[in-house]
Structure formats: C-alpha cells, structure tokens
From Swiss-Prot:
Function per UniProt: Probable transcription factor.
Superkingdom: Eukaryota
Keywords of this entry: DNA-binding, Metal-binding, Nucleus, Phosphoprotein, Repeat, Transcription, Transcription regulation, Zinc, Zinc-finger
Taxonomic path: Eukaryota, Viridiplantae, Streptophyta, Embryophyta, Tracheophyta
Protein name stated in the entry: Protein indeterminate-domain 11
Motif (Nuclear localization signal): 163-170
Compositional bias (Low complexity): 51-60, 264-280
SUPFAM superfamilies, alphabetized: beta-beta-alpha zinc fingers (SSF57667)
GO CC entries: nucleus
Matching PANTHER family: PROTEIN INDETERMINATE-DOMAIN 11, SERINE/THREONINE-PROTEIN KINASE RIO
Chain positions with Phosphoserine modification: 89
Gene source species: Arabidopsis thaliana (Mouse-ear cress)
Binding site for Zn(2+) 1: 178, 181, 194, 198
Ranges of compositional bias, category Polar residues: 10-45
Amino acid sequence: MMNKDMLLHQHQQPQQDENMSNLTSASGDQASVSSGNITEASGSNYFPHHQQQQEQQQQQLVVPDSQTQKKRRNQPGNPDPESEVIALSPKTLMATNRFVCEICNKGFQRDQNLQLHRRGHNLPWKLKQRSNKEVIRKKVYVCPEASCVHHDPSRALGDLTGIKKHFCRKHGEKKWKCDKCSKKYAVQSDCKAHSKTCGTKEYRCDCGTLFSRRDSFITHRAFCEALAEETAREVVIPQNQNNNQPNPLLIHQSASHPHHHHQTQPTINVSSSSSSSHNHNIINSLHFDTNNGNTNNSNNSNNHLHTFPMKKEQQSNDHIMNYHHSIIPPWLAPQPHALTSSNPNPSNGGGGGGSLFSLASPAMSATALLQKAAQMGSTKTPPLPPTTAYERSTHNNNLTTTMAAMMTSPSGFISSNNNNHVLFQDYNASGFDNHGREEAFDDTFGGFLRTNEVTAAAGSEKSTKSGGGEGLTRDFLGLRPLMSHNEILSFAGLGSCINSSASDQLHPKPWQG
C-alpha cells in the first residue's frame, strides 16, 4: 500500500512540475504579451500627444501675428475725418478753473469733475448719461496758435490734455533755462530731462563747427551744404562760359570755307615747362581781337593756352623779350586760339583743323630746325580772282597771328610734314591777288624783322658780357651761334619774297599804280 502511494506521488509530482512549468510559461507569455501590449499602448499614446504639442506650439506662433493685425491707434495729428473739431481760445484752453464750486470756490477743468465734487457737499448733481442709441462722435482739438501745424483741422489732436500740453510747451511762456546751452523750456520736467543729456554728445560739421544740440547741428549743416553747393556752382559756371567762348579766328575761317565745316578741330595739350613761364606771361598779356582791332587783357587765357619748352639760350634772352615786348604792335599780338587754327590738309584750303606745334616736340637743334624749314619750300598756286578789302585785311590778320605764334616759340617752329604748308596755305587759298599778297608779306615780315633787329642787337650785348658761351647751340655740326630769323627765312625760300616786297614798296610796278 505504501508502495502504491509512493508511486502515485512520484507520478503526480512530474505532472505537477509540468503543470507548474506550463503555468510559469503561460504566465511568462502573458507577462510578455501584457508588457508588449503596454509598450505598444504607451507608444501609440505618445506619438499623438507629441503631435498635439507641436500643433499647440504652431498655434501659439500664429496668435501674435493675428494680434498684430489689429487696428492700431491713429498717430498724433491724423484725426478721423468724421470727428468733431473743437477750437478753444488760449485763455479757455489754459484755464484751470473753468468750472467753480459755489460752496468752496474750487475750480475744475471739466464739468464732470465738478458734479462729482458736488456730491460731497450733498448738493444735487447730475452726470451725463448716454443712451445706447446715441451715436458717439470723437472730438478733436486744434491748436489756437495760427502758425502751428496743429491749427489745421486735418492735424488736430484727439485729446484735450494733449492739446493743453502741446500749447503750453510749444507756445507758452518758457520760464526754465538750461545752464549749459541756454535753451529754454516751458515745463520744468522737460528742462531737467534735457540737462541730463546736454553736453554729453558733440555734433561736428564738416566746416569744423561743434554743436551740443542735434537740432542746431541739423539746421547748420543744411545751411552749410547749401552754401557750399552755391559756391561750387558759381565757380564752375564762369569756367564753362570761358571754355565755351568761340574763337573769332576759327569762326571767320569756317564762314569763309563752309564746305570744310565738318572737319574736327583737334586741341593742343603741350606740357608746360618751368623755363617758359616768361613767354607764357608775354603771350597772355596780349590778346588779339579780329572784330575791332583793339588790344584787350585776357585774364582767362591760361585755360586755353599752354606754354612750350624753351632752350637755354632762350632763357638767357628772357629779359630782352620782357623789355622789347612792348615794341610789338598791337595787331601782331598772338591770339591764343591761333595755335589750333592750322590745316592738316593744305590742299583743301585754310578752313580745317590741325596743330601748329606737335603734341610733344622737344627743343630742336639748329640742324633739325633748318631741315624742317627747308621742307617748307615755296608753294605755287594758280592765280585766283581778286577779293574784297575786308577779306584781304582779315586774312592778313590771320597770317600775322599765325606768324606771331610761330615766332614766339622758335623751338616749335615746324612740327610735322602735315603742317609744312600751313604758313601760306590759308593765305594762298583765300583768293588774294598779287598786290594783296605783297602787302600782307610786307606788313607781316617787315614788322617782325624790325623787331628782330632790336632783339638781336640786345642779344649780342648779352652774349658779349656773359662770355660768349650762352648764345651758342649744339647741333650735329658742333657749336655755332643761333641763326637769325632772316637766315631761317632765306633758307626756307622766303627771303626772296621779303626782298621783293620791300623793293616793290620803293619801286611800285606799273600795274600797281
């Protein structure tokens, strides 16, 4: 019996163990399932909550934008057009006792305040009551001062207290004064606030003036800038007027040769030399006027004429030129514009442009000068019909002006092959007859030769006193004295013209009368 019980107990024990294991596994599975369900549930619950938080944050960000879109308060001085405009006198506006209590004689600015005060005295009082149907109109107040911007109803202020403060501060008596800048204020609080910042910051104008007040600085700067602009405009306008003055010589040439009017007029830009300041002053002191033949001082000739380089021997004769420049007749005075009145194409006549002197021609030696002069030669043109006396005299002045400019600066006597015939081309193309040509040559070269004789005599004395070395020039053939203008002209083939014109004066030809 006992053995059976033991066997049954042993047999039941594994079953119990198996059942326990099953229970444990089942519980474990349930636990795992439950834990998984909890995790899934928690996960499913977490994400929607997070999304809700994000949506709430986005809504909070949108709310300020909607709040800023609310209607703002009107700016001061921009009232509602439908508002009621009230104009008070200065006395009424500044009165402190408009409404007085008959018991204690206390004054009030508003009737509402007086009615509330009457309640304390057990007096009958009445407050204004508005019905719901009554249309409320806004009230605006204009400034009593006629010169004030707020006197206009369109710039009225919407508050009675505000208009009172405005009138008191801007137009009332200013009793309070700043000790630093002497600025006055009508309200003591404003003066105290100003004194805290007065002098702590400086405003400097471009002209060097210092200001402690910004408003004074702004006013001064506006005036200073306007004054500077006006001064600059006055300086620029006269220069433009001088630069735009037409050359009378060029005007006559363009009128005489209208078919060459389309040709451009190149300008001269020659670098000035310090040694040529004397000749520059001599040329500037003489101004040739082709209209009336008078000599006028040209104050603005520096804007049109540039000096040319001089050689050493020319510098030594500066005092001679200074002494004898008064000998030159007024009609031989060079026109500054004459330096640009030559013609680059001699075959077309004398109406074109061109430069008498090259852009950058250095000081030429005697040999180079003679070679250039030899290239000129003498030009032969067919006889042209005679012209009037006016054209003859005008072109005579033109030729005289050109020769004066050439003789003034011998270093730039001839600049290029394009200008070889510039001396006589305008003269030959102008339609002179033989008699007019001889008169022009005689008047022009006769005056220059007479002046040159005086200059040469003074130059010989100077060279003798200085040892004889200052009057020499270096060329390819060595040292030799400077050639006179007579030698240069005779070498260039012009001497015969001068001699013939001089002899014709003494012995006039039969056809000349």
